[in-house]
């Protein structure tokens, strides 16, 4: 017997509702974080992975530009002269070669300090540590872009370093929001004492600032990488 049109439409609607309910029930039984084939996708873990990858890239690039500034004819003579001044214990060169402005930030140095510090305070400390390089790297790219005879290899590395550091800072800010949603972050980035040298019209002053930056950046990038790995372990329990 053929169903009336109204009954036929009702049956189709009922079938659609039942199908939707079955699909909803199946979806509800799947963990909320199962977004990809192969397992659970955790945004916090992925952001830590992203930050660690950027820190690794930053560390590699810092070492590369350090070597190139010592070897490239654009800067090798100036850097060799500054090294000689450091050996002679010239105060200005010695400070540029050994003092890093990021040391003004109170960071955990001992193993038990990493364990005892609150997660949110740890993240905030790293934000200020990474943020300490925002201004120096921005001005480095600015000054290198304006200088004559700057090798493209040095300029491109400086740009990539600046971009990676900025993105790393964004990752850390996102992590802070996730671990402490109500936390208010007061950014306290220390000023870079050699900024005035970099912005100077004198070539020797500019290279003195680059000498300081190249000697500190690799060390700080390695420190950031180490602490990101520790923080990921403490926060997510992964890769401990």
From Swiss-Prot:
GO terms for molecular function: hormone activity; prolactin receptor binding. It comes from the Eukaryota. It comes from Rattus norvegicus (Rat). It is found in: Secreted. Glycans are attached at residue 212. Its main location: secreted. InterPro entries: 4_helix_cytokine-like_core, Somatotropin/Prolactin. GO terms for cellular component: extracellular space. Residues 1-29 form the signal peptide. The keyword ATP-binding does not apply. It holds the Pfam family Hormone_1. Belongs to the somatotropin/prolactin family. The lineage of its organism: Eukaryota, Metazoa, Chordata, Craniata, Vertebrata. This is Prolactin-8A7. GO terms for biological process: cell surface receptor signaling pathway; female pregnancy; mammary gland development; positive regulation of lactation; positive regulation of receptor signaling pathway via JAK-STAT; response to nutrient levels.
């Amino acid at each position: 017997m053929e169903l009336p049109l109204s009954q036929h439409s009702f049956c189709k609607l009922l079938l659609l509702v039942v199908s939707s309910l079955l699909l909803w029930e199946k979806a509800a039984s799947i963990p909320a974080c199962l977004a990809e084939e192969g397992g659970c996708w955790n945004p916090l873990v992925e952001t830590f992975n992203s930050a660690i990858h950027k820190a690794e890239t930053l560390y590699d690039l810092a070492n590369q530009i350090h070597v190139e500034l010592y070897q490239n004819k654009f800067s090798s003579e100036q850097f060799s002269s500054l090294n000689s001044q450091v050996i002679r214990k010239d105060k200005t060169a010695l400070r540029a070669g050994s003092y890093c402005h990021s040391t003004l930030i109170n960071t955990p140095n001992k193993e038990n300090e990493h364990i005892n510090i609150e997660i949110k305070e740890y993240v905030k400390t790293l934000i200020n540590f990474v943020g300490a390089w925002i201004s120096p790297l921005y001005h480095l790219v600015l000054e290198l872009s304006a200088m004559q005879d700057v090798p493209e290899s040095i300029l491109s590395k400086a740009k990539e370093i600046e971009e990676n550091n900025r993105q790393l800072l964004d990752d850390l800010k996102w992590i802070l929001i996730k671990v402490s949603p109500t936390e208010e972050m007061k950014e306290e980035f220390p000023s870079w004492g050699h900024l005035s040298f970099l912005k100077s019209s004198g070539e020797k002053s500019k290279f003195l600032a680059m000498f300081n930056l190249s000697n500190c950046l690799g060390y700080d990038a390695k420190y950031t990488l180490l602490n990101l790995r520790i923080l990921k372990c403490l926060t997510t329990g992964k890769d401990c």
